[in-house]
């Protein structure tokens, strides 16, 4: 360098001699330079101010910490700050490789771990969220099958358990924050050992053994699981001492009661004291068996039924059932068979007035009157009135007198059903009689058209001729006959009814109460007014009745007889269907009452049993 510099003629730069580089320094010797003395002093000062890491000591060299963890687990105060990675389903119930694969799978998912606290006790493992304090995992020790630290990660720890609902093997994985996975695994092992020890002690203390047979299909248990004092041996020995003393002491018969002595009642003495003091221990029972507590006999005796409803205990109460539900032996059935006769009873309701025709009393009165008149014979047809009443006006039957209802009994509903059946049978008999009468009427009409002596209906009877001697024209009978094309006056006008009877149509879908009410209404209308049955059966003229004696042919004063009366023109037979349609057209439209219990209801249907 000096020769080149001299040759070039430039200024010479002083040469700097560098110290040799250390042996282990990388790079060429020119780059290895030492720091000045001030820089080395500052570096030493900086290192002195830094926190030095503690020297790593393996878990096997720290047995004193493991002993502290074991005591904390038994007391239930052992906890570790961890990060909960999650859980996955595994195929095997044990194996370190199974746990390591589960940790790798959870870390590969990229799921964020939850900062939490792992509590380890002899009862189970609990994972609590450090931020929200939520319980993430609550695992019983009995379901844990395997736990181990991770050989690849120092702070990883996993355990395998059995899921209670799905019966699958689940692996839960953790990362310890301050401790190692070995310490967490050791703490879980201590918890499992404490749980097993507690279980063995419990089985030993209860003294329960099971003897299986040769086929292992049945077993016989000896002993009892009941213990008086949880885990205190002093209390477990107390019952044995008391039983031994009671067996050794001679039994003394109780003497007569002293005047000042009060003997305890059986209710105040506990069943346990009875068994300990009075009865010796059976030979087949074990010492740990404790007799069951039974209620004293005084508390089991019935003190009496509820007396809140005194009417229910009376004889006529429908809710009083001393026997089982056998229809022939029920008190109501027996009473109905014995005292069904209607005696002088007090009517349960007053007769309805003129103003309350649409009240409930009207319906009840109608039902009770139909009951009382069910067995009475039907009254005869009302006589034809020949007074000032016009021919077109219907004859009004006398109003039915009020009749008191029968005595109320517990089997009221059954009596109602019997009455309904009786009314139905009576209707069937009346229908048969009506059919027979109609046949007789037709025969009589045919005979009347051929007979020499004409007859006419009672409604068209001529007025009786005066008895005195007179000479006058014969009575004009034809003026009272209706025209041949006009319906008779009795076809549209029904006595006692403002409407023609509707055809009997079986109705389906009504309640039993409606059925009973309809049957009673029809019974009350049919029985006092049998004349309306003829109109229901058909619009045929009434049977021919011979004329009154006063209207028969009498000799004239001069000896010549009266001329024969001309035969009336036979009324055309009307079809029942046409008669009903004509009556429906002539009937005035009446507003339907809004009250369903009113007495003037329109009968829209009728049940025929």
Curated annotation (Swiss-Prot):
Biased composition (Pro residues): 19-29, 454-464, 558-573
Task performed by this protein: Plays a role in the process of neurogenesis. Required throughout embryonic neurogenesis to maintain neural progenitor cells, also called radial glial cells (RGCs), by allowing their daughter cells to choose progenitor over neuronal cell fate. Not required for the proliferation of neural progenitor cells before the onset of embryonic neurogenesis. Also required postnatally in the subventricular zone (SVZ) neurogenesis by regulating SVZ neuroblasts survival and ependymal wall integrity. Negative regulator of NF-kappa-B signaling pathway.
Coiled coil: none
Domain notes: The PTB domain is necessary for the inhibition of MAP3K7IP2-mediated activation of NF-kappa-B.
Identification of the protein by name: Numb-like protein
GO cellular component: cytoplasm; glutamatergic synapse
PROSITE patterns membership: PID (PS01179)
PTM annotation (Phosphoserine): residues: 224, 228, 263, 411
């Amino acid at each position: 360098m000096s020769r080149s510099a001299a040759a070039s003629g430039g200024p010479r730069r002083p040469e700097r001699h560098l110290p040799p580089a250390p042996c282990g320094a990388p790079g060429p010797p020119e780059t290895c330079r030492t720091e000045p003395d001030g820089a080395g002093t500052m570096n030493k000062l900086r290192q002195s101010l830094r926190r030095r890491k503690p020297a790593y000591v393996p878990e096997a060299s720290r047995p004193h910490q493991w002993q502290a963890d074991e005591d904390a687990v038994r007391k239930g105060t052992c906890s570790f700050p961890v990060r909960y990675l999650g859980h996955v389903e595994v195929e095997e119930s044990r194996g370190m490789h199974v746990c390591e694969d589960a940790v790798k799978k959870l870390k590969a998912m990229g799921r964020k771990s939850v900062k939490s606290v792992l509590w380890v006790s002899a009862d189970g493992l609990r994972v609590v969220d450090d931020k929200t304090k939520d319980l993430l995992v609550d695992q019983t020790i009995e379901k844990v099958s395997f736990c181990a630290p991770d050989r690849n990660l120092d702070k990883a720890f996993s355990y395998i358990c059995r899921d209670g609902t799905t019966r699958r093997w689940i692996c839960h994985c953790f990362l310890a924050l301050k401790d190692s996975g070995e310490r967490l695994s050791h703490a879980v092992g201590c918890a499992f050992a404490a749980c097993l020890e507690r279980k063995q002690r419990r089985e030993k203390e209860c003294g329960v053994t099971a003897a299986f047979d040769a086929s292992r299909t049945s077993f016989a248990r000896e002993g009892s699981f009941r213990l008086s004092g949880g885990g205190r041996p002093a209390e477990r020995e107390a019952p044995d001492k008391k039983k031994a003393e009671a067996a050794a002491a001679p039994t003394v018969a109780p003497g007569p009661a002293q005047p000042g002595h009060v003997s305890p009642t059986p209710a105040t003495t506990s069943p346990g004291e009875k068994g300990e003091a009075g009865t010796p221990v059976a030979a087949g029972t074990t010492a740990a068996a404790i007799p069951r507590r039974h209620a004293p006999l005084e508390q089991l005796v019935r003190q009496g039924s509820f007396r809140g409803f005194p009417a229910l205990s009376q004889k006529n109460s429908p809710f009083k059932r001393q026997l089982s539900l056998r229809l022939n032996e029920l008190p109501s059935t027996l009473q109905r068979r014995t005292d069904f006769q209607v005696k002088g009873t007090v009517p349960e309701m007053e007769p309805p007035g003129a103003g309350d025709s649409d009240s409930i009393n009207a319906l009840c009165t109608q039902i009770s009157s139909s009951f009382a008149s069910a067995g009475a014979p039907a009254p005869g047809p009302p006589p034809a009135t020949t007074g000032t009443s016009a021919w077109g006006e219907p004859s009004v039957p006398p109003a039915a007198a009020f009749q008191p209802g029968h005595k109320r009994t517990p089997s009221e509903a059954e009596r109602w059903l019997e009455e309904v059946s009786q009314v139905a049978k009576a209707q069937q008999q009346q229908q048969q009689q009506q059919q027979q009468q109609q046949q007789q009427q037709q025969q009589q009409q045919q005979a009347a058209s051929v007979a020499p002596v004409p007859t006419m209906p009672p409604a068209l009877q001529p007025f009786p001729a005066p008895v005195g001697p007179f000479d006058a024209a014969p009575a004009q009978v034809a003026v009272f006959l209706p025209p041949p094309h006009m319906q008779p006056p009795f076809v549209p006008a029904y006595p006692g009814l403002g409407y023609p009877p509707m055809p009997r149509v079986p109705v389906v879908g009504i309640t039993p109460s409606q059925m009973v009410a309809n049957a009673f209404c029809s019974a009350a209308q049919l029985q006092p007014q049998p004349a309306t049955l003829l109109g229901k059966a058909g619009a045929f003229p009434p049977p021919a009745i011979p004329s009154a004696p006063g209207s028969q042919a009498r000799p004239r004063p001069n000896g010549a007889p009266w001329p024969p009366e001309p035969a009336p023109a036979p009324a055309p037979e009307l079809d029942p269907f046409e008669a009903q349609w004509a009556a429906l057209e002539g009937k005035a439209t009446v507003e339907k009452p809004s009250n369903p219990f009113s007495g003037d209801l329109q009968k829209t249907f009728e049940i025929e049993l």
